[in-house]
Amino acid sequence: MGLTFFDKARELTEELEKTQAENIHQAAKLVAESIMNEGIIQAFGSGHSYAAAIEVCGRAGGLIPSKVIMDPAGGYYESIEGVGSLLTHRLQAKPNDIFFLISNSGRNPMGIELAEWIKAQGCKLIVVTALDASQTAASRHSSGKLLYEFADVILDNRSVQGDAALELDGLEGKVCGTSSFSAVLLLQQTIYEAVELMLEKGYTPPVYRSANIDGGYEYNFAIEDKFADRIFHL
């Protein structure tokens, strides 16, 4: 048996810990500053990157002032210029908000147009991407830009071109994409460090409790109510 996904996961975990520690710390500082100044987290990922976006929004152990930006087409139109700009008409942002945009290639117009809009609102932007792969990709947007170029902080998921990482005898292509796994590690560590920073500053961070434990729903609802006009805005 060759390299398995468990092997690759261990390898990636060590690589991310070694190479992304400082970037994670910088991202965590931005998140902490946003939350302590009444901002909210907004996260977007098209296609499979949506799985990473919901890692930081509305889940147990995450920060309550957060919302996922829904892609109504599930990624089918991410390569069509203008679709991202249309999506921004449904969004709202305040200067203290912080955004996560997750895209493995960072080349599609949808993410690029969202990034342009986010920066125009004066908000901080954290991009999760495969940096090496993105830097060698051709942009699909007429501006020629790639998503990472808009970032205040880049979290590099260290995925390979095409995402799939493992080879099997008898198979021409590769299997097992790694970007989702890497994104979860990067994002959860960022939230952990952000919460730690807030506590160090004497600020009690609003963290979700599981709705499936007694009292969790009531606890969450009481805090969500303070942010309802922001986190439930469609």
Curated annotation (Swiss-Prot):
Pfam families referenced in this protein's UniProt entry, alphabetically: SIS_2
Annotated S-S bridges: none
A GO BP entry: carbohydrate derivative metabolic process
GO molecular function, one term: carbohydrate derivative binding
InterPro entries hit by this protein: RpiR-like_SIS (IPR035472), SIS_dom (IPR001347), SIS_dom_sf (IPR046348), SIS_GmhA/DiaA_subfam (IPR050099), UPF0309 (IPR022951)
Record SUPFAM superfamilies: SIS domain (SSF53697)
Domain SIS: 31-205
PANTHER family associated with the record: PHOSPHOHEPTOSE ISOMERASE, SEDOHEPTULOSE 7-PHOSPHATE ISOMERASE / DNAA INITIATOR-ASSOCIATING FACTOR FOR REPLICATION INITIATION
HAMAP family: UPF0309 (MF_01240)
Entry's family note: Belongs to the UPF0309 family.
Protein name: UPF0309 protein lin0024
Species of the source: Listeria innocua serovar 6a (strain ATCC BAA-680 / CLIP 11262)
